[in-house]
Curated annotation (Swiss-Prot):
Annotated protein name in UniProt: Fatty acid synthase alpha subunit aflA
GO biological process: aflatoxin biosynthetic process; long-chain fatty acid biosynthetic process
Pathway assigned in UniProt: Mycotoxin biosynthesis; aflatoxin biosynthesis
Positions of the Carrier domain: 75-153
Family: Belongs to the thiolase-like superfamily. Fungal fatty acid synthetase subunit alpha family.
InterPro entries: 4-PPantetheinyl_Trfase_dom, 4-PPantetheinyl_Trfase_dom_sf, Fas_alpha_ACP, FAS_alpha_su_C, FAS_alpha_yeast, FASI_helical, Fungal_FAS, Ketoacyl_synth_AS
Sorted UniProt keywords: Fatty acid biosynthesis, Fatty acid metabolism, Lipid biosynthesis, Lipid metabolism, Magnesium, Metal-binding, Multifunctional enzyme, NADP, Oxidoreductase, Phosphopantetheine, Phosphoprotein, Transferase
Cleavable signal peptide: none
């Protein structure tokens, strides 16, 4: 080697050839061997395993020998047992060390035949021969035949796939072996063993770097060494010492050598720069540096002069996209009126007249014709139903009178302003309390004005022009008196108000402006999401008709924002307003800042309150001039102050306020008087504002010194009066100066004065506390007083109870008994479908937790406990040292009351609708493939032979393949022209927010084993957990208990899905495409019915039907409809219904392409938080927010529920599904479900409420057939609502309600699909509005519209299930949750007068019935009608209700205990591992309809007994073919209703039905003699059917007797005086004698017409009594 012309003495020149010395040229060396050390190994085969044996390892440089003390590890070959262990562990996803060899494949696979089959196939492929039935052989016995083997096909392929799919590109098999050899000293055979161990613990994804790969292989080596019992030590540890000793090269030589290399590199760099024309002189860099230095100097100057806080304070924030609008005053009016008439109590209005007057004023300001009609309608209805409520009559009358008198008036701000003043008291214990107390000597509506007149200079108004000495104070006071009597109207006016934060004077003025009907634009310096709730509530409480409130974020300390704000107001593309007035009340506090402390914050406040006020006014002038407006000056109310430095320590505040007074003179000296008018407002001491709250306790003392203090409402009125037309006109004549200081300026040194007053109050409080302490001390020492020593009391820590939440049992006397006379025995419980259990799993956790948020907006303490458990933050322990909750991570005890403080923030951030937090789905990094054509040959890479062959098949001539040193591997080169797919990551922000399950939720908390968790799709786990909870909700602590009451075939499963399990579907399609390894049984979990199958296999084991509805977003309602029909048809007695769905990246992308989901990026740009993005029915809605989870209900036949004592949450009165019209758009919303309300003419049948209470006439609205055609059809026990579906004169919806004695007016709640999409949210209300109008719902009685998806997002399939759960909770609690995200209701929905959209939760007295509506893509529409359970109970006799109550109390108490125990022990899901019967008994049990399960009292287990089957009591079965009394009553009542409308006035009707099968009285000679005439007997005996003849005559006699409406002499009275003759034309005739004839004459009947109809099993007769002169 030569350096600078000198040959190194220690070197020699070698001539190398590339063909012969390739290794030396590439610096590859053979592995060195320590001299004198012989490696000791066991006998091993000379040939190494094919895949595991690389070409000879690269030779390492011979730097230093290994120390002779190094431990040598024997190189041992693999055993067959190890290979089998690895293959099994890989399939079971278990570490090899955790896999016992004492078990067989069958045992380890848990009985899964598909897994056994797969493992046996892998082992067959691995070894040339294996024993028979390998699945039954213990793993350790696989090594007997051949103790040392090589890797076979299966294991070799697994290792190859591991390396190709999970290792970095530069970390191939050779690199892995080299690392294992160099670092750990492992020989080739042990290297192969490590590779084998790795296939059982693959990394989840491709490792990013070689260092990560080395760390992974180090971990695998450690696991291998631990399983083999050997100790591994890195070889570097033994080499360090020798390596350091071997360094013999002179450092100077090395430095000289490096210097020469650097010089050569610099020369090459310069040559390349010259060729590429790159300037290396640094001139451009110098220019850049100079520019940077200049800019830095300017920045430093700005920072030094203005301070960082000033620069931060002037940053612009105006963004009109973030503005919020509130304007749906008409919906607020509906909400207030409807809530008033449905409230449970009127005591609030009785006890608080002021609150009621405020309420009346609010409604008067919103009064229109629609509201007046609504009030009249509701008051008529409520007169009968609520008249007993104290205070109702007076309140209702006053409300109607108030609305009637103001319906045509403009809205007016009617300020109720009692004269109150500050009052400070000090309690006995020395606590200082402040309150507002009435002022003395004044009263009435104008008491405030009276109090002002008491002081000569409390307020004043005069001209600010020195040339005009006019005093307008008296005019102002007179106008204020008039305003307090009549109100102030601001209709048609527009205002801009800045500084209207909570509790401010500006906010008080805004309230008055809204009450007066004005349009107001308010600026806020905070993000809209943090202030929207406050301004929404302000508008809800004060917005009058025609009013509008807009809120826009704006930094008025920014010059850019000042200009942008005014441009937005006047721009035709913006608001296009011309301001009537501006109130620039924005201010900045600058406490404790004296003159020598002036800083950037002070200057920022000066800019905000003075400089930028001038800027805003100047921009208004510019805009008005540009628009040519010179005759409508904008009034400016300048916020002046008496503080001209008298307070001190407030920065530039006095100077800013004082400088504004210059505008009094500028208006004359400058040119803008045609555009602006000026009115200065000197604001005095205003209590309870941000600046003065701390001084409230001394305000009373201040007033004693002749100073008047004002409340916020009083000051707001003062200011608002200046905006009325009279004073606006005065202001246009010249500037006004309003003094509302209350003589505050007369005080001297205010700081000292205030400090003295504070000190005085504090001293008084301290004296009282000291006196009290002294009194206690004296009492303790007084004679005869024994000191009492109290032991310290341990602090109480409240505990929260985990409860299921069972429904309230209605009070029989108060709620059920009033219904019983008209409903008892009206409906057979066997013909009713009831909901006995429900559950859900969604973004808020369980149904209980979702309801707390939906109805109250916050969690209870019990809710926090449940959520913390569900999110795996806490767990329950029960041992000798502690019983209770502990932190999951630390194990530290956690009290129930501490959970909110410890985990509240975490829970809030990881529940509900939020940015997606899933580990498997990152929308910000969505992976897609880009097809790329290779333009240049790519470098070679190594793959297996199979992969190389596959690549040749795909790329043909565009791929080059050559052998490598490894016989099972090849070197592959992709050549120019090859087409490859390159993965790339793109952000999919559109769908980056969703309603995910609470973070930390795991099915393991419910008791599902880990192997099952990894085996099935997540949606299956959701469904299993929900089904288990639904049974607890039904009070069923073990699902198998139901089979004590029903047969195995009578429980159905109708849980559906829109897309099934996406995780397994993705594995089946995408992972296969990527050549990733997938489970062998992945296909089975892609079917939509598989979760239901898992539910049956793991929990139920029933033989009932599994039907899987697929209705897109309407899947849930389709499932309910299927379950309802199944029970009504008698196919099942109990059904699981509901739906499940998961979040799926591909589906989210598809929804985004349809523009159905909300664009999260745009929503964030508009200032919306994730929780605000789902806004059903709102004017600003922009699409739905996805969610996922599961919802389940347990439906049951009514008699079974009574028999079992199950809690009844609701009655499913009816359901319907409908398609839609012809079209070409699958997702288009439709109106086919209108057919649920189909009827030709509104039913004229008598309501059940107006009928007599006798059984024969207790019927609700029933089928309106024109004539009786079949007695059999009448006696059919199917429910009348179902029979009515086939009629034309009664809608199925009406019939469903009529079945329970309800009308269309009794629907109280409509749960809307309400997805927050443009199309659905207009179509759905239109459908319901059309239905209500068609069915004749009384105008003015709107339904409460619930939009649950504002809280949950849209979960697709479970949507209707969650909605139904919410409806059940509404029925139970009487609470109607509001849509808190509804800022402004879409104006198009104003015409939906039958709907009211609440924005807050409303408490109702009761909810009778609900209507649930759901829609889905693909022409799916459905509705469900539900009825409160008290109507079901009212059909039962009281003893039966009371017996049921006893049963259900026992069941629910046990259910609560069992559920709490299951949560604490993590055993909510009870997995069944075997059938509850012996296998030989299965056919007998399946075939025996009376087979029932029984419980072993000793073990508590449920089993079918082999020796006996419980028999059904024959007495419980009615005689075949005999109609029940209920059916007879229904039939008679139906005919009576159909006949009565066609009768003459005063006519009578009688109906009777006689079953033929039970009519045996004709065989009794005495009966025949007493009741039939001779001619009747002769006719009957000659008839072909003697039984039918006698029965028809008896039936006719009974009908005639009823027609006569005479007093009965008892069931034994003879009927011979009523004779039925056989007419010549075949029609029967009635002949009356004796008492019967007398009764007819007394009733005024001229005659009786009779009709007799015969059926196969019954005879029915109808008798019509005709009045004299009637036809």
């Amino acid at each position: 080697m030569v350096i600078q012309g000198k040959r190194l003495a220690a070197s020699s020149i070698q001539l190398l050839a590339s063909s012969l010395d390739a290794k030396k040229l590439c610096y590859e060396y053979d592995e060195r061997q320590a001299p004198g050390v012989t490696q000791i190994t066991e006998e091993a085969p000379t040939e190494q395993p094919p895949l595991s044996t690389p070409p000879s390892l690269p030779q390492t440089p011979n730097i230093s020998p290994i120390s002779a003390s190094k431990i040598v590890i024997d190189d041992v070959a693999l055993s067959r047992v190890q290979i089998v262990q690895a293959l099994v562990a890989r399939k079971l996803k278990t570490a090899i060390a955790q896999l016992p060899t004492s078990k067989s494949i069958k045992e380890l696979s848990g009985g899964r035949s598909s897994l056994q089959n797969e493992l046996v196939g892998d082992i067959h492929n691995e070894f040339s021969s294996i024993p028979d039935a390998p699945e039954q052989i213990l793993l350790r016995d696989f090594g007997d035949a051949n103790p040392t083997v090589q890797l076979g096909k299966t294991s070799s392929a697994a290792v190859a796939k591991l390396i190709s799919s999970k290792m970095p590109s530069d970390f191939n098999a050779n690199a892995i072996r080299a690392h294992l050899a160099n670092k750990w000293g492992l020989g080739p055979l042990r290297q192969t063993a490590v590779l084998l161990y790795a296939i059982a613990s693959e990394p989840p994804s491709r490792l990013a770097s070689s260092s990560a790969a080395e760390e992974y292989w180090d971990n695998v080596s450690s696991m291998y060494a631990e399983s083999c019992g050997i100790t591994l030590r890195p070889r570097q540890d033994t080499m360090n010492e020798d390596a350091m000793a071997s360094s013999a090269i002179d450092p100077a030589v090395v430095a000289e050598f490096s210097k020469g290399h650097r010089r050569l590199g610099v020369q090459q760099f310069q040559a390349l720069a010259e060729y590429l024309q790159i300037d290396l002189s640094g001139s451009q860099a110098s220019q850049s540096d100079a520019l940077v230095a200049e800019l830095q100097q300017k920045v430093d100057l700005w920072t030094a002069e203005m301070t960082p806080e000033f620069l931060a304070g002037i940053s612009p924030m105006l963004d009109v996209k973030k503005s919020r609008r509130y304007g749906s005053w008409w919906n607020m009016a509906r909400q207030d009126v409807l809530a008033f008439y449905r409230r449970p109590s009127y005591s609030e209005f009785v006890d608080d007249a002021l609150a009621f007057k405020v309420f009346l004023n609010r409604l008067c300001n919103r009064a229109d014709e629609a509201l007046l009609n609504m009030v009249r309608s509701l008051s008529c209805d409520a007169y009968f139903k609520q008249g007993s409520l104290p205070g109702y009559h007076a309140a209702s009358r006053l409300l109607e009178q108030a609305i009637t008198s103001t319906v045509a008036d403009c809205p007016k701000a009617r300020l109720i302003l009692p004269a109150v003043g500050p009052h400070t008291t000090i309690t006995k214990d020395g606590t200082i309390e402040y309150a507002e107390a009435p002022r003395q000597g004044v009263s009435g509506p104008t008491a405030y004005i009276q109090s002002l007149r008491q002081g000569a200079s409390f307020i004043g108004l005069k001209s600010a022009d020195v040339d005009t000495q006019s005093n307008l104070t008296d005019a102002l006071l007179d106008a204020m008196c008039l305003a307090l009597h009549n109100g102030i109207s601001f209709v048609g006016k527009t205002f801009l108000v800045t500084g209207a934060g909570q509790g401010s004077i500006g906010a008080g003025v805004v309230r008055l402006l809204l009450e007066g009907g004005a349009r107001v634009l308010v600026t806020t310096s905070r993000e809209p999401a943090t202030t929207s709730r406050y301004f929404q509530q302000m508008y809800d409480n004060h917005g009058a008709k025609f009013s509008e409130l807009r809120v826009v974020p704006c930094n008025l300390a920014s010059a850019q924002d000042c200009e942008g704000l005014i441009r937005h107001v006047y721009d035709p593309r913006g608001l296009n307003w011309d301001l009537d007035a501006i109130l620039p009340f924005a201010a900045a506090s600058d406490y404790s800042t004296e003159m020598h402390d002036i800083r950037g914050q002070s200057e920022l406040g000066h800019r905000l309150m003075l400089v930028n006020v001038f800027r805003v006014l100047g921009h208004i002038v510019h805009c008005k001039r540009d628009a040519g407006v010179d005759c409508h000056p904008t009034q400016v109310l300048l916020p002046l102050s008496p503080n001209h430095g008298i307070f001190g320590g407030d920065g530039m505040y006095p100077e800013s306020k004082l400088a504004l007074e210059s505008l009094f003179h500028r208006i004359r000296s400058e040119s803008w008087s045609d555009q602006l008018s000026i009115c200065g407002v000197r604001i005095g001491w205003t209590r309870s504002t941000g600046l003065m709250t701390a001084h409230d306790i001394i305000a009373e003392t201040v007033e004693e010194h002749g100073i008047r203090t004002f409340s916020v409402a009083e000051m707001a009125l003062n200011i608002a009066m200046l905006l009325t037309p009279d004073f606006v006109a005065h202001c246009e004549d010249g500037p006004l100066d309003a003094d509302f200081t209350g003589s505050l300026g007369t005080l001297g040194s205010i700081p000292g004065f205030l400090a003295q007053l504070h000190q005085k109050v504090q001293l008084a409080a301290e004296v009282i506390r000291a006196v009290q302490a002294e009194d206690e001390h004296e009492r303790f020492l007084s004679p005869g007083t024994k000191p009492t020593l109290q032991a310290p009391v341990a602090p109480m820590h409240p505990r929260s109870s985990l409860r299921v939440g069972y429904p309230r049992l209605p009070d029989y006397e108060q709620e059920i008994r009033p219904l019983s006379p008209r409903l008892e025995r009206l409906q057979d419980p066997a013909n009713a479908v009831v909901v006995v259990g429900y559950s859900e799993l969604g973004p808020w956790g369980s149904a209980r937790l979702r309801w707390e948020i939906e109805s109250q907006g916050q969690w209870t303490s019990a809710g926090y406990v449940e959520l913390a458990w569900l999110m795996n933050l806490i767990r329950h322990v029960n041992d000798e040292s502690y019983v209770g909750w502990v932190d999951t991570q630390t194990g530290k005890p956690v009290r129930d009351g501490e959970i909110q403080a410890l985990y509240g923030d975490h829970i809030d951030n990881h529940t509900g609708i939020r940015p997606i937090q899933s580990t498997s789905y990152n929308p910000e990094r969505m992976e897609v493939l880009q097809e790329v054509a290779v333009e240049e040959d790519l470098p070679e890479f190594e793959v297996s032979q199979l992969t190389a062959d596959a690549m040749r098949l795909r790329h043909g001539a565009n791929v080059s393949i050559r052998p490598s040193g490894n016989p099972d591997a090849c070197h592959v080169k992709l050549k120019r022209g090859a087409v490859i797919l390159v993965p790339k990551t793109v952000p999919f922000v559109w769908g980056s927010c969703a309603g995910e399950l609470p973070k930390g939720w795991t099915p393991a908390k419910y008791g599902i084993p880990e192997n099952l968790i990894h085996q099935v799709d997540p949606v299956t786990l959701y469904t299993i957990c929900c089904v288990a909870e639904a049974f607890y909700s039904a009070g069923i602590t073990h699902p198998l208990e139901v089979f004590r009451h029903i047969h195995l075939s009578e429980l159905g499963n109708f849980i559906g899905s829109s897309m099934g399990g996406p995780t397994k579907t993705r594995q089946l399609y995408r992972d296969v495409y990527f050549d990733h390894e997938i489970p062998s049984d992945v296909l089975q979990d892609t079917y939509l019915n598989t979760p239901a199958a898992w539910v049956n296999m793991l929990l139920l084991g029933c033989t009932g039907p599994i039907k899987t509805p697929v209705g897109a977003c309407a899947t849930g309602v389709e499932s309910i409809d299927s379950g309802y029909e199944s029970i009504m048809a008698g196919k099942t007695k109990m059904c699981l219904v509901g739906g499940y769905d998961d979040l799926q990246e591909e589906a989210s992308y598809g929804f985004a392409q349809l523009k159905a989901t909300v664009n999260v990026e745009e929503e964030i740009a508009c200032g919306r938080q994730p929780s605000e993005m789902s806004r059903p029915m709102a004017e600003s809605r922009a699409g739905f927010v996805e969610a996922h989870g599961c919802g389940v209900q347990l439906l049951c036949r009514g008699d079974i529920a009574l028999q079992m004592g199950l809690p009844i949450y609701a009655v499913i009165a009816s359901s319907a599904m409908a398609a839609d019209k012809i079209g070409s758009s699958v997702p288009a919303p439709g109106q086919g479900i209108l057919s649920f309300s189909r009827e030709r003419a509104r039913s004229s049948m008598i309501s059940v409420t107006s009928r007599p209470s006798s059984r024969s006439s207790t019927s609700s609205e029933v089928s309106d057939k024109s004539s009786l055609t079949s007695i059999t059809s009448i006696s059919n026990p199917a429910p009348r609502a179902q029979r009515a579906r086939s009629t034309t004169d009664m809608a199925p919806l009406r019939a469903a309600l009529a079945t329970w004695g309800l009308t269309i007016d009794d629907l109280d709640v409509a749960s809307l699909h309400g997805t927050s999409t443009r199309g659905n949210d207009l179509n759905e209300p239109e459908v319901i509005e059309t239905q209500m109008r068609h069915l004749g719902r009384t105008p003015g009685r709107p339904l409460w519209a619930i939009c649950q998806k504002s809280v949950t997002g849209h979960p697709k399939a479970p949507a209707a299930a969650w909605m139904l759960n919410g409806c059940l909770q509404v029925l139970d609690s009487g609470l109607v949750p509001g849509n808190r995200n509804l800022d402004t209701l879409d104006e198009a929905l104003r015409s939906a007068s039958h709907l009211c959209f609440p924005t807050r939760t409303v408490q109702l007295r009761e909810v009778k019935a609900f209507l649930l509506t759901s829609f889905g893509f693909g022409q799916k529409g459905g509705q469900v009608v539900g009825v409160a359970p008290k109507y079901f109970f009212a059909t039962l006799p009281r003893p039966e209700v009371e017996g049921y109550y006893r049963k259900v109390r026992v069941r629910t108490e046990a259910g609560d205990r069992a559920y709490a125990a299951a949560v604490m022990s993590q055993a909510v899901v009870k997995i069944q591992t075997q059938n509850p019967y012996d296998e030989p008994d299965a056919p007998r049990i399946f075939l025996d309809p009376l087979a029932r399960i029984s419980q072993d009292p000793s073990t508590g287990q449920y089993r079918f007994r082999s020796d006996a089957t419980p028999a059904l009591d024959d007495d419980a079965l009615p005689p075949p073919g005999e109609p029940t009394e209920l059916v007879k009553g229904i039939s008679s009542a139906w005919i009576e209703e159909k006949v009565r409308p066609h009768m003459s006035p005063g006519g009578t009707v009688g109906v009777d039905l006689v079953p033929l099968a039970s009519f045996d009285a004709y065989k009794n000679a005495i009966f025949v003699e007493r009741n039939y005439t001779v001619r009747e007997r002769d006719w009957a005996e000659k008839s072909a059917d003697v039984r039918a003849a006698y029965a028809s005559r008896w039936c006719a006699k009974e009908a005639v007797f009823k027609c006569l409406q005479t007093h009965s002499q008892g069931a034994g009275a003879a009927m011979k005086e009523i004779e039925i003759e056989h007419g010549g034309n075949g029609a029967p005739k009635v002949k009356l004698r004796g008492a019967a004839q007398t009764a007819a004459r007394q009733r005024g009947l001229e005659g009786v017409q009779l009709s007799i109809s015969y059926g196969d099993d019954a005879v029915i007769a109808v008798a019509l009594g005709l009045m004299s002169g009637a036809s």
